[in-house]
Amino acid sequence: MIMSSRSFLEYRAMFALEERDLDGVVLDCAGGASGFVAEAGTRGVRAVAADPLYAHGAAVLSERLSAGLEQGDAMIDANAERFVWTWYGSAERRHELRRAARRAFAADIRRRPGSYLAAGLPRLPLAARSVDLVLCSHLLFTWADRLDQEWHRAAITELARVSRGEVRIFPLVRMGDGEPVPFLGALLADLRAAGLSCEVRQVPYEFQRGARHLLAVTGSRTG
């Protein structure tokens, strides 16, 4: 899987975030090297990130991120027809946002290590309903070729367990080929049968062609 570094601005667009969505505690899972928590902190937003990679030292994180950036760029180059540049405007603008996010993450994890939890799905060391909003970027569904339907069910159920409000997941297509996730419909049926509310919403962001929807999940009230 690729470790990436997306910006606060990208998160706002991908997750259709409004100011009121950021009033409570926000969990970014899996956070990777996203700059979201860092910039959220400068805006007075209470945000934390979770990722198993945070258990490693700065050198390992830097190495993984460098490799991830190279892999991501190579994947984009190899599948150029599957990407839309309207939101970014240019490749350089995307690179600028990613470089700034990477710098913000690197500085913030040193300055505020308590905001970065070394943990991963499908089980988080967090109490039930301990955050107000969960954001999950480019993990669920993105890697559906490696993570099966049962893993997704367990992971989403866990994210809903720790959230008092919504879980927002983006995107809903697979990495690289941008194809629909074959088990999405069956998974949503399973989640709804378990008492979770699931809603697919369009967002004001599209980079991977066809990836312009998020999944919002609410409803878990058990620990």
What are these regions (language model features)?
Residues 21-53:
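Conserved class I S-adenosyl-L-methionine
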Residues 155-156, 163-173:
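Conserved beta-strand signature within the Rossmann-like core of class I S-adenosyl-L-methionine
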Residues 42, 46-114:
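Class I S-adenosyl-L-methionine-dependent methyltransferase module
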Residues 122-135:
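A short acidic, Gly/Pro-enriched loop at the edge of an enzyme's catalytic core
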Residues 175-223:
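Class I S-adenosyl-L-methionine
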Residues 3-25, 33-36:
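Conserved alpha-helix/loop element of class I SAM-dependent methyltransferases that forms part
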Residues 112-124:
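Conserved SAM-binding strand-loop segment of SAM-dependent methyltransferases
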